[in-house]
Amino acid sequence: MSIISAIFLLLLFAALAAIMAQVVSSSNTTAAQDVQGSRALQAAQAGVEWGLFQLDPNGDSATLPSCFATNPTVLTTISDYQVSVRCTPYPGATTTYAEGGKTLRVFEITATARATASQPLTIEREARVRVEKCRDSTITVAPFDC
């Protein structure tokens, strides 16, 4: 075997090693982003659950609840994530519906979770839910939910 073919094989193997290192590195980054994305989605879902509880925690009000905040409320208790939760009446600002002697109002709660750790890419997930709250005028004791 000549020296030229030996150098060629050495360079070929070095290039293959560099390509393999790049593939392994990118797959590790992708796996880490998948984990961060899953955690961000769970944080957003926790924000939605918090928002649902804020609407009517005990069902002890005889009147329909209102949104807890139309401007985003930022939750700081979920570590490594900034979760902002917003409530809006759906589809309009004060729309209520009457159905069979019951009064209904629909709310949309949106929670957005963003990873706060410094990363080259921003990881962000959003969860959204629409919920109907109902009051029945014939119910005279709490809980007043229909």
Please place each PLM-identified region on the residue numbering.
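Aliphatic-rich helix starts adjacent to a transmembrane/signal segment
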Residues: 1-43
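Low-complexity, Gly/Pro-rich coil/beta segments used as flexible assembly/activation regions
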Residues: 41-42, 46-110, 114, 131-146
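Residues embedded in well-ordered secondary-structure elements
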Residues: 29, 33, 98-100, 118
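Residue-level detector of alpha-helical recognition elements and their boundaries
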Residues: 22, 28, 59-62, 66, ...
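Acidic/proline-rich low-complexity IDRs
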Residues: 9-10, 63, 120
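A short, surface-exposed beta-strand/turn
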Residues: 119-137
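Weak global preference for isoleucine
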Residues: 3-7, 19, 78, 109, ...
